[in-house]
């Protein structure tokens, strides 16, 4: 069963495959690296982007943020430029915030947009050079929705780990029809049944606390989107529109809304959707549902 902990993740825009995934991959690499060597033994680092990850161009900021030690769920996206500034101005990378090495994005990031690795088109390799002349590297695949697997798991899946967990949850289902049938048989609502499945792995307070954090992040995203103005990144000079629409709707708020005035409610729904869309395009914190797209 795919958990709500998997479906709804706090991430960074604009793409779960091209920003959240690579950032997670960098986090995983740091975890693996620290088990292999001391950070002080690192003399250099190289990044290779393949296929679809290389095709959009210089969208490497998410990987660099991950190597700095930032995670998609906790990074303050308002400070992204501040975090990245030393890399571009001083040509230095502070690995995990603990060890500074020389790093030149033009020299140390390699783009192979016409090379597609066997498992998935969204692939990257991170390699560190060590003081003894050796190196340590890992290849990762960003498979969508912020999910990442390493090359070892992709080429040699563990059959035990690959066994679906659907058989051990209280109310297994493989389709919406099966979900509704389980609800009918056990006299449960959809929300009650899903909660029971979630609580098979973690206690209810943990589930509710996580969902509260997701809801708070969603609300914050809408608020930021309604407040921020300017031009969206990407080079197309697209102007943000949510702030102006928000001001317009607020000016009309004293006008009575009748019970059947569905169009008035839709104006606010459209505003919230636009606000989130613009925050995502701007590289802000958003919630995957189940992807940024």
Where are these regions (language model features)?
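Catalytic cores of large soluble enzymes that bind and process phosphate-bearing ligands
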Residues: 14-17, 21, 54-58, 75-76, ...
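Conserved phosphate/anionic-ligand binding catalytic regions in large, soluble enzymes, centered on
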Residues: 8-28, 59, 281-292
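Conserved catalytic cysteine-centered active-site region
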Residues: 1-8, 12-13, 74-80
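Phosphate-/polyanion-interacting regions in eukaryotic proteins
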Residues: 133, 141-145, 163-233
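Accessory carbohydrate-recognition regions in carbohydrate-active enzymes
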Residues: 12-55
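Beta-sandwich/jelly-roll carbohydrate-recognition scaffolds of carbohydrate-active enzymes
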Residues: 40, 45-188
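Buried hydrophobic packing segments
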Residues: 22-29, 66-70, 273-276
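Accessory "access/gating" subregions that flank catalytic or transport cores
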Residues: 204-292
């Amino acid at each position: 069963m795919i958990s709500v902990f998997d479906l709804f993740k706090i991430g960074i825009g604009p793409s779960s495959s091209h920003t959240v995934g690579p950032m997670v991959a960098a986090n995983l690499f740091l975890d693996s690296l620290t088990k292999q060597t001391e950070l002080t033994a690192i003399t250099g680092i190289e990044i290779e982007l393949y296929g679809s990850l290389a095709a959009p161009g210089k969208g490497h900021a998410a990987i660099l943020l991950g190597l700095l030690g930032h995670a998609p769920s906790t990074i303050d996206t308002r400070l992204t430029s501040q975090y990245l500034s030393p890399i571009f101005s001083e040509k230095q990378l502070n690995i995990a915030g603990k060890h500074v090495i020389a790093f030149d994005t033009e020299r140390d990031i390699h783009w192979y947009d016409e090379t597609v690795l066997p498992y998935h088109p969204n692939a990257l390799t991170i390699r560190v050079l060590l003081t003894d002349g050796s190196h340590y590297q890992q290849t990762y695949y960003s498979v969508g929705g912020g999910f990442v697997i390493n090359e070892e798991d992709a080429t040699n899946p563990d059959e035990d780990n690959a066994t679906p967990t659907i058989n051990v949850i209280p109310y297994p289902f493989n389709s919406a029809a099966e979900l509704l049938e389980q609800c009918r048989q056990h006299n449960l609502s959809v929300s009650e049944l899903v909660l029971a499945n979630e609580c098979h792995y973690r206690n209810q307070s943990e589930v509710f606390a996580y969902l509260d954090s997701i809801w708070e992040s969603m609300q914050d995203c809408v608020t930021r989107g309604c407040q921020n103005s300017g031009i969206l990144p990407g080079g197309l000079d697209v102007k943000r529109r949510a702030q102006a629409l928000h001001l317009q709707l607020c000016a009309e708020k004293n006008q009575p809304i009748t019970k059947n005035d569905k169009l008035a409610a839709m104006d606010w729904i459209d505003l919230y959707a636009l606000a989130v869309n613009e925050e995502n395009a701007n590289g802000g914190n958003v919630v995957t549902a189940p992807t940024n797209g």
